[in-house]
Design a protein with these regions (language model features):
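Non-heme Fe(II)-dependent double-stranded beta-helix
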Residues: 1-15, 21-106
Length: 106
């Protein structure tokens, strides 16, 4: 079953990105959020703790091969969306970093 609608495909072609709603289950999202907080070793209820290393100004975290990230990258709906975009089933799953951009300090 196709993940991308004709409108999604046209948006991709025009803008170079597309948003896939509900691409992974909510449990997967919660696992990534928990993994990020654990990696940062900060108190998610204490905003003052959010602004110390290892958070860079760009928000990129050197959190590479974490299972929660792999689970999302390999999720069937994500795979199928990339397969439709690139026109092939022969895809390699790669890993990337996570990002944490806390709001500006009050």
């Amino acid at each position: 079953m196709a993940v991308l609608s004709p409108e999604d495909r046209a948006f991709w072609e025009e803008n170079g990105y597309v948003i896939i709603h509900d691409a992974v289950p909510r449990e997967n999202l919660a696992a990534v959020v928990d993994a990020i907080w654990d990696f940062l070793a900060v108190d998610r209820t204490d905003p003052e703790s959010w602004y110390k290393a290892p958070i860079s100004k760009a928000g990129m975290l050197e959190m590479y091969p974490h299972q929660a990230l792999w689970d999302n990258r390999q999720h069937p709906k994500v795979y199928e969306a990339f397969s439709e975009i690139w026109g092939t089933k022969e895809l390699w799953v790669s890993f990337d970093r996570a990002n944490m951009n806390p709001p500006a300090r009050p």
